C-alpha cells in the first residue's frame, strides 16, 4: 500500500504559491535491504546499491564513522530500477574527515531518494560530492550539523536534467560551533521538459561566532519547457558571522552558438557539450580513475 508523503522540507517556510516548502511524493511499504557499517580509515570503500527486484520500494542504510584523526572515503553508486531510498549517516569525530561521493546511475523510470546526514565534532570535516546523471527522478535531502569549533562542510553537486525528469534537492547546514565553515556549490543543465528545485540553507545558530558560509548555484537552461527553482536561504541567530549566496541562471547566447557553429559544431551538439560540462568537471576532480571512467561512460549513454 502506498501513500502520499512530504519530503525535502525547508527549515523555514516561505510563500506556498512558490511550491518550494516541501515536495509531495507517493511512497509505500519499504523492503529493508539492511545496513552497511563503514569505519575503515585511510581506505576507499566502494558500495554499489541496487533496489530489490521483487519489491516496489526498497531501502538501504549506510553508517560511516570516522574516528578521531582518521579519514574515510566512500563511493556510493546508486542503481535504482524502481523506487530506492538510501539513508547515509556520517559520524565525524575530532580532527577526522569523511569524503562521500554519491553517483546516481538509475534506470529511466526509477525514483531515487537520498537522505544524507552528518555530525561533525571539533575540526571534523565533510566533503560531499553528488553526481546526478539525468535518468529517473532523484530527490536528495541532506542535513549536516557542525557541532564542534572549526568543523567544516564542503559540497559539490553536478546534475543533468532532461526529458520530463525531476531533480529535487534540499541541503541544510547548521553551524553550532565557533569558526565553522560551509561551502555549497551546485551546477548543472536542464533540457527538454526537465524540472529542478535546489534549496540550499545555511543556518548560523547561537554560539557560532566567527563562522563563514557560502553557497552558489549555476544553472544552464536549454529548453523552453524546463522549470527551474533556486531557493538560497541564510538564517542567522549569531553576530560576527559571514553568509553569502548567489545564483547564475542563463541560456546559451548567440555569441557562444556562433563560436561553436564556426567550428562545424551544430547547435544541438553545442548544447550537449555545455550540458555535460558540470558533471565532466566533477568527474575529473574526484581523484579516482575507476569512478571517473564509469561516470564519463554513463554520461555518454544518457547524452
What would you call each of these model-derived segments?
Residues 1-53:
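Long, low-complexity, mixed-charge
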Residues 14, 279-282, 295, 299:
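Generic structural signal of hydrophobic/aromatic residues within well-ordered alpha-helices
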Residues 34-258, 262-265, 286, 292-303:
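Conserved beta-strand/loop scaffold segments within soluble protein domains that form the structured core
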Residues 259-281:
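Extended amphipathic alpha-helical segments enriched in small hydrophobics
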Amino acid at each position: 500500500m502506498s501513500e502520499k508523503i512530504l519530503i525535502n522540507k525547508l527549515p523555514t517556510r516561505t510563500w506556498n504559491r512558490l511550491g518550494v516548502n516541501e515536495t509531495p511524493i507517493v511512497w509505500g511499504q519499504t523492503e529493508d535491504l539492511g545496513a552497511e557499517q563503514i569505519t575503515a580509515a585511510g581506505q576507499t570503500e566502494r558500495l554499489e546499491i541496487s533496489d530489490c527486484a521483487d519489491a516496489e520500494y526498497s531501502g538501504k542504510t549506510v553508517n560511516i564513522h570516522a574516528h578521531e584523526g582518521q579519514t574515510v572515503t566512500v563511493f556510493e553508486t546508486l542503481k535504482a530500477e524502481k523506487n530506492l531510498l538510501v539513508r547515509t549517516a556520517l559520524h565525524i569525530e575530532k580532527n577526522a574527515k569523511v569524503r562521500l561521493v554519491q553517483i546516481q546511475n538509475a534506470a529511466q523510470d526509477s525514483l531515487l531518494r537520498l537522505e544524507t546526514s552528518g555530525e561533525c565534532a571539533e575540526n571534523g570535516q565533510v566533503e560531499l560530492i553528488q553526481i546526478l546523471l539525468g535518468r529517473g527522478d532523484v530527490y536528495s535531502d541532506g542535513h549536516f550539523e557542525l557541532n564542534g569549533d572549526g568543523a567544516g562542510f564542503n559540497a559539490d553537486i553536478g546534475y543533468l536534467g532532461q526529458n520530463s525528469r525531476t531533480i529535487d534537492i534540499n541541503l541544510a547546514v547548521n553551524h553550532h560551533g565557533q569558526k565553522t565553515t560551509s561551502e555549497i556549490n551546485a551546477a548543472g543543465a536542464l533540457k527538454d521538459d526537465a524540472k529542478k528545485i535546489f534549496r540550499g540553507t545555511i543556518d548560523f545558530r547561537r554560539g557560532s561566532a566567527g563562522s563563514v558560509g557560502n553557497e552558489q548555484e549555476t544553472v544552464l537552461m536549454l529548453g523552453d519547457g524546463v522549470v527551474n527553482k533556486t531557493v538560497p536561504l541564510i538564517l542567522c541567530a549569531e553576530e560576527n558571522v559571514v553568509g553569502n549566496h548567489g545564483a547564475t541562471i542563463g541560456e546559451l547566447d548567440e555569441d557562444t552558438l556562433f563560436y561553436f557553429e564556426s567550428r562545424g559544431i551544430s547547435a544541438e551538439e553545442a548544447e550537449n557539450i555545455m550540458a555535460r560540462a558540470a558533471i565532466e568537471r566533477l568527474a575529473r576532480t574526484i581523484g579516482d580513475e575507476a569512478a571517473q571512467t564509469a561516470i564519463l561512460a554513463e554520461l555518454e549513454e544518457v547524452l
